[in-house]
Every structure is written in C-alpha cells, then in structure tokens.
Amino acid sequence: QPNAELVTDPIERVEAGGVRTKDGRLHELDVLVLATGFDGHSFMRPMDLIGRDGVDLKDVWAETTQAHRSISLPGFPNYFMLVGPNSPIGNFSLIDISERQLGYIMQLIELWRGGTVNEISARQDAADRFNASVKDAMGDTVWVTGCQSWYLDKHGNPAMWPFTFDKFCDDMSVPDLDE
C-alpha cells in the first residue's frame, strides 16, 4: 500500500519521530511492527534427530507436526520432549504443563530403569488416535473458525490443546503401556 513500507535495514535507534536505520535515514511512522520470523511449528528444529530405521524427524514432520500426548514420537525410542505439538501452552501455565509432562516422562524412565520395559516408544496407532481426538475436539473453537494463525499448520491441523486442564492432568498422571 502507498502508506506502508517494509524496512529490513538494521535499526540504529528508535526516536520520538520514528526509527533511524544504520544508513542514517529516519523512517517516520505511526506503528512499528517487529517481526522475528517465529515459526510455531518448528519443534526441536534445527536439531537433527534420527529415529529407528534411519528415519529423520524433518521428514516425519515435513507435512504436519504431531506427537503422542505431546511428548513422544512413534519410531523414536527413548526420546521425549517437553511442550511438544498440542501441548496446552496457549491456555494454561507453561511451568505447570512442563512439570506435569516431566513427571509423566520420569514415570516412563523409571519403568525402563526397573526393567519393566527395554525401550519406550509410542505406538503409531495410539499416536494416530490421540491426534485424531485433538483434531475432532477442536470442533468450532476459536482456533479453527477461519482465521489463519500459528495455532494451525499449513493443512489446518491444530497445534493447540482443545481439552480441559483436568483432562491434561489425567493424561499425564499414569503412563498407559498399551500406547
């Protein structure tokens, strides 16, 4: 638009009349928008993570970013993450969510340490059920009613937790070894 300009030059300083860039030019403005290029769907990246049979996480998440219970991935044994895809970080306390996820993960690690299991990896069918339930529960919530935002991936799959805090607490209380 004629009344808008995208300026990508390095900023020298912000002044009362606008923003002065390193080239000495003063850009008069009414609004200053600082865009950092945040990508809400780049969980764990740019880290290289290779799972069973040489599968690369970048390939697994090339189309959509999903995980089982927001903490584990089928085909990536003994790998866990905090605040992964569909973690309820937009509607609850990040600290409380992280602590509950860590408690769940520690229970799984204790099962491994105690010899109950040799490895821990989410089953694909369990992850598929979890992700389908998340998508179904979004229904007509504000996150999926037509606005494009970081709450949705490029295919419209939700990145948020659509359930209650109580359900999250229940889901993080005791590991289900059938999953």
Where do the model's predicted regions map?
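Flavin (primarily FAD) cofactor-binding/catalytic cores of flavoenzymes
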Residues: Q1-S93, E99-G114, V174-D178
